[in-house]
Amino acid sequence: MKSYIDWFEQRGIRVLPIPFDTQDHEVYFQMVNGLFLPGTDRGPDRASAAQNEAFMHSLRTFYEMSMRKGEYFPIWGTCFGMERLIELIGGSRTWKSFPADGLFPIRISRDTTCSRMIQSFPLPYLDYLEQEKSTLQYHEYGISVEEMKTNPLLRRYFSVLATSLDKSGKEYVAAIESKHYPVYAVQFHPEQQRSTLPFLDFFRSELKMNSHRCPMLPRVGKVISPHKCAHYEGLKHQMCYFFS
């Protein structure tokens, strides 16, 4: 979690953690400018059925509230977050095994002229994404391009912005964008690299289009921002926030 908070704070974005099993969806919805679904090493095969159900209930509730209220409410999913957005829109768990661990280029789809995200990037940066080991991929699951094409719900809702290759050379979807709503997702981890800050800049510009205000942000900031995470030497790269 710390890497995501540090990533957002680089651009002055304040973070308000939302418990995945909260019942106060309306309260949180009015306090945030958008929803971010982070990656996690606790995938659907590791989480309990109750945890998965609670997470999906909250995601579905926030999504339906944004649709019902007709507000510009950006939603972003990273890795695990992308998988759950696909499950929400596609109606079932359609991801398959696409293991990847390391830095990989991504291939930008041909028809991205209508993409809000891709069109926000300068051409030299798009070249960098395709020609260099530009994105950190760390996942076991993903979704194939074929699945995005054959699932009518996904095909109508999302545009495939980019693809990448897993350890065995199989192609999977690396980035998607809703055709009509501010919903975005990537399978890689832009929060782990400074070179992927343009993705954050884009999402920041999307958040600015929402007018919600959080009256308790100063208090939240005092709790979160200066907080020193507990660091456990036995868990490599593991840093945790604790909330009472």
Name every feature range the model reports, one short phrase each:
Residues 1-180, 187-244:
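N-terminal beta1-alpha1 cap of cysteine-dependent amidohydrolase-like domains
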